[in-house]
Amino acid sequence: MDDPDGNIELIRRIYGFDWAAVGKRADGFDRLRDLVSDDFQSQMSAELGGRTIGVDGLALFVEALEQDFSEFHYEAEEFIPGDGDKVVVAGRIRCVGRASKVPLSQEFGHVWTIADGTPTHVEAHMSRAEALSAAR
């Protein structure tokens, strides 16, 4: 059953801690594991490709980012109800290149799917517009 307000608050909790941050990852992924389904899946953006299964799979993907970035985190700016049990999160990725020390910023859009009050899937996009389109 659709509960847009409840779904948004649930997803907002996920972005309330920096689960992808370098140096904070272990605690962040423990907290993420408490909120999502055991078979949680992450679909990476078309530019990156790939899918991870479970929080451990997502953790391995994020760990690989540490090779390129000394800092990496998501800044969620908007939580938007999508169709059915979907929530769109739009914001910016902020990171710093490990070798170059250059700060980078990139728009992102995530489409979360919730089943029975538990997030089961997130689909990553490189823009708010792409995520909104995918959530319809």
Label every PLM stretch briefly.
Residues M1-D39:
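Short acidic-aromatic low-complexity motifs
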Residues F29-V87:
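A solvent-exposed, acidic/Ser-Thr-rich amphipathic alpha-helical stretch
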Residues G54, A99-V102, E130-R136:
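A short, polar/proline- and glycine-enriched secondary-structure boundary/capping micro-motif
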